[in-house]
Amino acid sequence: MNLITFNIDDKLLNKRSYSIVSKKKNLLFHFGCQHNKSFEKINKYRVAKVYELNKKGNLPNKLKYLEKSYNELLKNLYKKLNKAHNKNYDQNYWEILIGKWLKTFVHQTYSNWEILKKIENKYNIKSFSKISLSDNFFIPENTWHAHQLIRSSQHKYNLFHHWLISKMLENKKKIKINHLSLKNNLSIESELLKLSKPNKYQNIFYKSLDNKIFYYLWDVPRKIKIEIMKYFKFLNIRLNTKTIREYHPKYFDRDLIFYNEYQPNNFQSFLKNIIKFTFPKIFLENFNTLERMYKKLNWPRKPKYILTSYPYYEELFKLYCAQNYFSGSKIIITQHGMCNIFQYDDALGPASINKTFFHAQLSWGKNRKKGLKKFLFTKKYTTKVNKFKFKKNKKILLILYSLSEMEDRLPNGYSDNNSINKIIYNSTIKYLKQVEKSLLKKNDIKILQNNRYPMLKNSIKKKYRNIKFMGLEKSFDKVIFQYNLSVHFFIGTPFFESIYLNQPTILIFDSKIYSSFDKKFLRFIKKFIDNKICFTNAAEAAEFINNNYTNLEHWWKSPKRQKILNEFCEMFCGKSKNLHEDFKSITKI
């Protein structure tokens, strides 16, 4: 059997290479084809099936090994970077700069390593179709570019994963390599560069008597920012965004800097062996530009606290954090609070960065699992309790997720993304079939699509052509009050927003979509099921809505149900009773 790890439907090969591939008995990697335009069609290709949700037994050990590999490579890299740049910074300093890139790179590489291992054990792989590509094509400009190469399946010419797996198979003597060529008019290198974007930073107007608080890329409502400026008596206002345009790249011998004696079939050795082809230029050849720009910044020097949320892609701000951390500043992260609903860490999620250099990470509520500190829900802010009023002219909004074709999780202990998308599709169809005709026309669908092909939308439209669809053009919190009810087929941010805003909410819960949950969260799922807020069967949810739609107000406002919802909010999407007290808690952390 011949293994293919590029998208065969993209037809990137020249005629000769394509004829070679088409004659073979092929097995495709999970992202190796279009997966059809509809779930109703049978895939004409044989796609490897290696994801097993029930095999969770060794998942904790795999995740520990993943963390160990990350720390081992970080330790190796920070010494090399100090030597290359003639510095003497500690490991935490460099982790602030390269940590998010490195964590994603290690995790995604390990996922592919484990997927490939399972394919080799399950299928009789005799050969591998390899496209001839230069290793240097995949050296990223910065963290954003690296993440687009590693995680994006949107771009037709993104062959990073194919290249990565081909490097894993280079020393497998039992597998024959069939060399293929691209069409003559394709310039993959220039296409991959299009995935990058310029390094930018914000011009800030800042005034303070004591430099106590500085926030940047802080994802909280404007009301909270205004109140915290009043409370701590400072001004922190973004004026505009600037682009770094002038670079003076410095030459480094990557072969020499990243030299590693390769050990076959050793994952950590493999990582060290390919790092020279994957390490972002901004931390090596263009690091002098970052240092030069840092000296020109008008941001406050040595603030006591730096508040931020998603600093991953602004390299200059990360350097600012590293320099000020080195000088004693405390870095506080307010991030996506969903991290603490799962039993195991999401290795690519907001809590994924090693916490040694962060003074604190603030949660969305009281659940302090994984070291998170209590804070409030930062996606929305309100001091008023929403008193829902049912209105006949309002409708029902279905919230669907469509996950990427690019797998980013380990094969044991999780479902693959395509299977999850199909579960969401089947649940949606089951729900729509059961909804009464008079109510069916009141249903709109909002899809948060993260994949290349709109298969979920296409599949639903084939059966229900008149349903109105919306995408990411408007965020959920901007449309929620236009509807009487939201029905969620996936536990995502909109689910928490809806409950926080006290809008009628129903969750269609299928355990096959998720890995293991935190015990506290599971207890609330059980309470939600008992109180008809959550259903494990989409048809039963539809039947409940058929019988209770005009009575939603009474159902949602019942004291027992409201008590459970308030307890859930307190734990997972906390409301502020006193903003000033919440701010005080920051300075006491």
What do these predicted regions represent?
Residues 1-589:
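Catalytic-core helical/loop segments in enzymes performing group transfer/polymerization on anionic/lipid-linked
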